[in-house]
Amino acid sequence: MIIAKQYRCIHSATCHCTKGHLSEEVLFLMVQHLNWNPNVIATLSCVCKWFDDLAKRLLWKEFCRARAPKMMSDLQSSGSHSVDGSWRALGKLLIYCSGSSKGGLFNDVQISGHFVHRTRFSRTSGRSFLPPQCRTDDILYVSDPCEHLDQGEDGDLGFFRGIFKSFSMSKVRKLLIKKGTPFHPTEVCPYCKAKLWSMLQAKMIPQSASCRLGAYEDSIEYYVCLNGHMLGVCTLLPLSDSEGASEFQ
């Protein structure tokens, strides 16, 4: 069920919305009891601005920590209590495959976005997507590919997504800027609406990425946004071929 966001208040000191409903502590315990169900959090966000502020400030953060505790601990290990692009955007990235619209980021690929029940994000896998000169310092978590099989002429497609740690300080970002890589002229990040760089256009996709994905080398394309969210697509090798592929370092 899709619920339209409705802001019925302006969150002022005299706002009636802040009176007569459960306190933040009770709402926190309620959503915690429901195991940080993203459907519940999203529904609460649509009630009014007060609930939306609470969700963005607290509930989505706890959802991320519950869904991927080790990754969240690493992303915050520098001492920051926030992440690039907001907790809500990161929560969406954890559970949503963005797909692609025709004429969008991935040309003629047209696959609807959808929620995924569970996805594994790996820091080890992320190293395979970094240019060799960036692997010493940069940290990137990347998901296993979300498989969309038998896509006609496109074959078996895999969509993957990821998140950089402290992207604003990363070597990848500095290298993209040094190369003068332009932003995509029309499309933005589906998770935070920030501008996107094409790693393919910047010629920064290493061979190791195709081996990690089990994909054809010339079929991989991915983007990184200003907040360090990554999304990409590849054409997967037939299972018999990809099983025998060795990882390129």
UniProtKB/Swiss-Prot annotation:
Signal peptide: none annotated. InterPro entries: EID1-like, F-box-like_dom_sf. It comes from the Eukaryota. Residues 16-68 form the F-box domain. This is EID1-like F-box protein 2. It comes from Arabidopsis thaliana (Mouse-ear cress).
